[in-house]
From Swiss-Prot:
CDD domains: Ribosomal_L13. This is Large ribosomal subunit protein uL13. Pfam families: Ribosomal_L13 (PF00572). The keyword RNA-binding does not apply. Part of the 50S ribosomal subunit. SUPFAM superfamilies: Ribosomal protein L13. One of its GO terms (molecular function) is mRNA binding. The keyword Ribonucleoprotein applies.
Length: 142
C-alpha cells in the first residue's frame, strides 16, 4: 500500500468560527493551531497546507489562569540598540486583545514559509461580530 500524499489542489477547506469568551488562552490556541495545520483531517500531510480557516470572535474575553494577567510579559524588539519594549498581558489586552491569541497560535505553528501560510488563515476579532458570513462558517466548540 502506498503512502497517501495530499496535493494542494485536492484539499477542500472549511471555515470555522470559535468563540473565545471564557476559554483559557493556551488551550484555545493549541486547538486552533491543530485546525490551521490540518491535523484533524485524515488526509494530513506534514509538507502540505491541509488546514482550514478559523475565525475567532470575542478575543477580548479570553482567560489567563493564575497571575499571568500581571506577570506574563510580552517582549518586542525593533532591531536597534536599546530598542526593546516590554508589555504585560493586561496592557496587551487593553491595547490589542487580538494580538494575544495571534502570538499564542503563531508560536504553535511551524516556523518558515508553510507556517506563515497557515497563519494567514487565522482571522481574529475582539468583539462578537465578523465580516465572514458569506463563507458560511461552522460553529466549533472547543
Amino acid at each position: 500500500m502506498k503512502t497517501f500524499m495530499a496535493k494542494k489542489e485536492e484539499i477542500k477547506r472549511e471555515w470555522y468560527v470559535v468563540d473565545a469568551k471564557g476559554k483559557v488562552l493556551g488551550r484555545l490556541a493549541s486547538e486552533i493551531a491543530k485546525i490551521l495545520r490540518g491535523k484533524h483531517k485524515p488526509i494530513y500531510t506534514p509538507h502540505v497546507d491541509t488546514g482550514d480557516f478559523v475565525i475567532v470572535v470575542n478575543a477580548k474575553d479570553v482567560v489567563l489562569t493564575g497571575k499571568k494577567e500581571d506577570q506574563k510579559i510580552y517582549f518586542f524588539h525593533s532591531g536597534y540598540p536599546g530598542g526593546h519594549r516590554l508589555i504585560t498581558a493586561r496592557d496587551m489586552r487593553a491595547k490589542s486583545p487580538e494580538k494575544m491569541i495571534y502570538l499564542a497560535v503563531k508560536g504553535m505553528l511551524p516556523k518558515g514559509p508553510l507556517g506563515r501560510k497557515m497563519l494567514k488563515k487565522l482571522k481574529i476579532y475582539a468583539g462578537p461580530e465578523h465580516p465572514h458570513q458569506a463563507q458560511k462558517p461552522k460553529e466549533l466548540n472547543i
